[in-house]
């Protein structure tokens, strides 16, 4: 094998191992599915996945002092409406991507 092929293989391995682990579960479904499931009240698995994602963020990442973490005073119904808006605007995205964006937005609303 030539040196350039070996170097290329090493480069590919280096870049692929730098990616984060894939997202599993309901958060990996499409926003299009979220919108359709919301219409018939079948969205609770996805919503609970998002709530778990935010809870995990609070447990392992959040360093602030707000007693409810990034949730603040936001309840699950409000999070569902926020995801409705996100997923309607981004149907090819995922609830996971929406949850990440929501965490950023919620954290920005907390007192500094």
Report the location of each language-model feature.
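Sec-dependent N-terminal signal peptides
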Residues: 5-14
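Short N-proximal segments of mature Sec-exported proteins
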Residues: 22-85, 89
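N-terminal signal peptide c-region/cleavage motif recognized by signal peptidases
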Residues: 15-20
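Surface-exposed, polar helix/loop patches in the mature regions of secreted/periplasmic/lumenal proteins
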Residues: 76-112
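N-terminal secretory signal peptides that target proteins for export/translocation
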Residues: 1-3
């Amino acid at each position: 094998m030539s040196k350039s092929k070996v170097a290329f293989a090493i480069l590919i391995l280096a870049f692929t191992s730098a990616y984060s682990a894939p997202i599993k579960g309901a958060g990996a479904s499409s926003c299009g599915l979220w919108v359709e499931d919301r219409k018939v009240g079948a969205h609770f698995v996805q919503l609970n996945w998002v709530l778990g994602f935010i809870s995990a963020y609070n447990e392992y990442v959040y360093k602030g002092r707000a007693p409810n973490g990034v949730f603040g005073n936001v309840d699950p119904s409000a999070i569902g409406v926020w995801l409705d808006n996100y997923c309607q605007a981004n149907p090819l995205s995922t609830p996971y991507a929406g949850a990440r964006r929501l965490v950023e937005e919620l954290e920005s609303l907390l007192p500094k």
